[in-house]
C-alpha cells in the first residue's frame, strides 16, 4: 500500500501546482485533520474535513499570491505515514518572492490522506504571507 501512497501524493502535489483543487481533494479522506502553523497572514491552526481545507486554507492562497507552488524534493515512505520534503515557491500580489522549505507529514489510510501537518521554515513563510 505504501507505494500507492507515494504515487497518490506525488499526483496530489502535481495537481496542487496546477491549481486543480478538485483533484487534490480526491486524495483526502472527507474527515481529514489538517494543521497549519500560521505566520504572517497565513492560515493557522487545525482544520477538520476536506471542505474546510478547501474553503479555509486553499482559498486564501489566490487572495495573497499570483504564483504559489509546493515543489517536493523527495518522499519518505513510512507505510501509513509519508513525509514529503520540499519547498514552497511563490510570488505575492505585491511582487515579493518567497521560498520556504517544508516537511509535510501525512498519515494515510486506504489510499487517502487522513491527516496533514505543515512544518515550514518560519521566517520566509511569515514574510511571504505578510508581503501581499
Model regions and ranges:
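A beta-strand edge to alpha-helix "cap/lid" segment located at domain peripheries
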Residues: 1-4, 58-132
Amino acid at each position: 500500500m505504501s507505494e500507492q501512497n507515494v504515487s497518490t501524493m506525488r499526483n496530489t502535489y502535481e495537481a496542487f501546482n496546477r491549481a486543480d483543487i478538485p483533484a487534490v481533494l480526491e486524495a483526502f479522506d472527507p474527515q481529514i485533520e489538517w494543521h497549519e502553523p500560521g505566520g504572517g497572514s497565513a492560515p493557522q491552526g487545525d482544520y477538520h474535513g476536506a471542505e474546510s481545507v478547501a474553503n479555509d486554507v486553499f482559498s486564501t492562497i489566490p487572495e495573497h499570491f499570483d504564483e504559489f507552488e509546493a515543489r517536493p524534493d523527495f518522499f519518505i515512505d513510512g507505510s501509513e505515514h509519508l513525509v514529503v520534503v520540499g519547498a514552497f515557491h511563490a510570488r505575492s500580489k505585491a511582487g515579493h518572492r518567497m521560498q520556504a522549505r517544508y516537511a509535510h507529514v501525512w498519515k494515510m489510510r486506504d489510499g487517502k490522506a487522513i491527516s496533514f501537518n505543515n512544518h515550514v521554515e518560519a521566517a520566509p513563510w511569515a514574510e511571504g504571507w505578510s508581503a501581499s
